[in-house]
Amino acid sequence: MKKINIFCCTIENFDLLNKLPKNIIPLGLGKKDFPSNWLNDKNGKNISNLNKYFGEATGMYWIWKNKLNDYSSDDWIGFCQYRRLWLNDLLDSKQKYSSSNLFSKLLKNDNKNFDTNDSVILQPTFFETDSLRGQFVKNYGSKVLDDCLNLLDANDKNDFKDYLEGNSLSICNMFIAKPLIFDK
């Protein structure tokens, strides 16, 4: 039977995370202390001290360096956030929020996406009136983006420039992948 573990990244200790199904594993990030039954990015090989700069990526790094070998090629590794969980079905916006409503909709191992894919990402978010580059420049200016582009080799730079001219992206550092894909 394939194993599907979703690591739920958080910088806070929320009681709700202790009530999640066993395959959704709380992963505490950053400086704070977390319950002993949680994983945290301060043990083993880690870059926890960089969490204030890289957010969930410190947890992803920790899983990559410390847990990846615990998985077989048929297993799945995923990430979500304490405010954004993977669901099988959409919550009806008129539905009253309760943990039982939420828990009944959480992603299940028998979801058909796991039968036909090696990775799953969020449905993209689309910008209606601007490109990704335009949106970034409006918020942060062009210097940072241009400096980053100049760090890339020619092929990657051109590919990334093309991507930035598009208007869609998958947000939130949420994905689920087979270990081989995650390792890349």
List where the protein language model places each region.
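ER/Golgi luminal nucleotide-sugar-dependent glycosyltransferases, focusing on the catalytic module
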Residues: M1-K184
